[in-house]
Curated annotation (Swiss-Prot):
The lineage of its organism: Bacteria, Bacillati, Bacillota, Bacilli, Bacillales. This is Glycerol-3-phosphate acyltransferase 2. One of its GO terms (molecular function) is acyl-phosphate glycerol-3-phosphate acyltransferase activity. NCBIfam families: glycerol-3-phosphate 1-O-acyltransferase PlsY (TIGR00023). InterPro entries: G3P_acylTferase_PlsY. Keywords: Cell membrane, Lipid biosynthesis, Lipid metabolism, Membrane, Phospholipid biosynthesis, Phospholipid metabolism, Transferase, Transmembrane, Transmembrane helix. It catalyses: an acyl phosphate + sn-glycerol 3-phosphate = a 1-acyl-sn-glycero-3-phosphate + phosphate. The gene is plsY2. Probably interacts with PlsX. It is an enzyme of class 2 (transferase).
Length: 190
């Protein structure tokens, strides 16, 4: 059951809701539009707010669901491992030639299971940053940093380590966005 749990966690993470929503309902492969990223922000920019919200919610839920798999399947695998595999699946999707999204929403779903109050803190930072700057990328990075700071204060060492790993990954995956922010060429959300 443990191997099945691990495989399913990765495969669930690999499901690209941005690709599915784009192809099924809009007849568009969003990899060919906008940033080409298989995430909620590109879905929003290419397909509209409704699609962006649906993709964001679905990506969050898949992160949470992956963490629930050990409970559902009576597995001894730690939910953190399942969450990490879902995040890796989102970034390196087997269903999309190992090219996925930046996993911000999927990581949010994982932390919704592990640290709901930490996610609330991150969400507040995300919304405030987005309201003031209109940069989704900056909002995502600052929300991740806020979650890490929350974890340092209130969570155990494993959650602290995971939140550090996630924020470092998010920043690395957003390095082109950081360059564009510094150059003043990053797209703002309208």
């Amino acid at each position: 059951m443990n191997i099945l749990t691990l495989i399913l966690s990765y495969l669930i993470g690999s499901i690209s809701f941005a690709l599915i929503v784009g192809k099924m309902f809009y007849k568009k492969d969003i990899r060919d539009y906008g940033s080409g990223n298989l995430g909620a922000t590109n879905a929003y920019r290419v397909l509209g707010i409704k699609a962006g919200v649906i993709v964001a919610i679905a990506d969050i839920l898949k992160g949470t669901f992956a963490c629930l798999l050990p409970l559902i399947l009576s597995s001894t695998i730690n939910p953190i491992v399942c969450g990490l595999l879902a995040i890796l699946g989102h970034i390196f999707s087997v269903f999309a030639s190992f090219k996925g999204g930046k996993a911000v929403a999927t990581a949010t779903g994982v932390f919704l299971f592990l640290s709901p109050l930490g996610v609330l803190v991150g969400f507040v930072v995300f919304v405030l940053t987005l309201l003031f700057t209109k940069y989704v990328s900056l909002s995502s990075m600052l929300a991740g940093i806020a979650l890490f700071i929350y974890s340092l204060i209130f969570e155990d060492k494993v959650i602290i380590a995971l939140s550090l790993l996630i924020i470092v990954s998010i920043i690395i995956l957003h390095r082109q966005n950081i360059k564009r922010i510094l150059n003043g060429t990053e797209n703002k959300i309208v």
